[in-house]
């Protein structure tokens, strides 16, 4: 049995001053307060958060359901939302995985390929972003249980 290689954790030479936050369609529709809490936590670290208001969906639901054309159309609308070379923080392993690993393939050999590859290179899942900037949580009392999202393992 071979050993499992742990994921490479993203690091920054210095803490970013600005990030984009891709809120995901599910978070926006069902748990917007969790998205706002994540944004607040990033801002408390002295980082400006930019939330492009035109964002909608990464295309993952359509892509995972076998509808790449629909995924292409939905994801294409997101590509122009992140023009600055800032990290794109995503609070979802599945959405982050779609953007980081599948966007380059989805847009391969199209006019959108370079933008997709650029965006993919800047994707970082929210909890991995906190680790990368050296976030240390305060002790607020009773401990909570945290489940490590297996889908997030490949997007760090």
Task: Write out the residue ranges for each language-model feature.
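Iron-sulfur cluster-binding electron-transfer modules in prokaryotic oxidoreductases
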Residues: 1-156
